[in-house]
Amino acid sequence: MNFKYIVAVSFLIASAYARSVQNDEQSLSQRDVLEEESLREIRGIGGVLLSAGKAALKGLAKVLAEKYANGKRTAEDHEVMKRLEAVMRDLDSLDHPEEASERETRGFNQDEIAKEKRILGPVLGLVGNALGGLIKKIG
């Protein structure tokens, strides 16, 4: 009899616990849904504002680029153009952040490879000449 009582009480406790866990999960999922909806709204508003800002900046950058492209450029003008080009790339990277990071990585890698070639080219030439001289002396 005691065993039946213990089993019944254990079953009641387990079912009550399962119901409380299920209720907790439901309330958490409802909160998550509400938070996700509010985040979507915020992102939508932010996206609209960002698009408007990007369009204005792109227009300004194009006007400035046309102004500097038509006349003779000084070194200072050249720097301004470089900055404008960087701003345009940054604005484009806001649309496609993964592609922008890949382009930056690719550009960085190409710069590093060019530096290595500039350094290693003459060094390999000297090593090749030295080895050629050694082979001639040995042979």
UniProtKB/Swiss-Prot annotation:
UniProt-listed InterPro entries: Bombinin (IPR007962)
Subcellular location: Secreted
Tissue specificity: Expressed by the skin glands.
Keyword Signal among UniProt keywords: yes
Ranges in coiled-coil conformation: none
GO cellular component terms attached to this protein's record: extracellular region
Major location (coarse): secreted
Domain of life: Eukaryota
GO biological process: defense response to bacterium; defense response to fungus; killing of cells of another organism
Transmembrane stretches, start-end: none
Modified residue annotations for Isoleucine amide: I138
Signal peptide (from-to): 1-18
Keyword annotations from UniProtKB, A to Z: Amidation, Amphibian defense peptide, Antibiotic, Antimicrobial, Cleavage on pair of basic residues, Cytolysis, Fungicide, Hemolysis, Secreted, Signal
Residue positions where Asparagine amide is found in the record: N70
Propeptide: 19-43, 74-118
Record keyword Signal present: yes
Function of the protein: Maximin-4 shows antibacterial activity against both Gram-positive and Gram-negative bacteria. It also shows antimicrobial activity against the fungus C.albicans, but not against A.flavus nor P.uticale. It has little hemolytic activity. It does not possess a significant cytotoxicity against tumor cell lines. It does not possess a significant anti-HIV activity. Maximin-H3 shows antibacterial activity against both Gram-positive and Gram-negative bacteria. It also shows antimicrobial activity against the fungus C.albicans. Shows strong hemolytic activity.
Family note: Belongs to the bombinin family.
Protein name: Maximins 4/H3 type 6
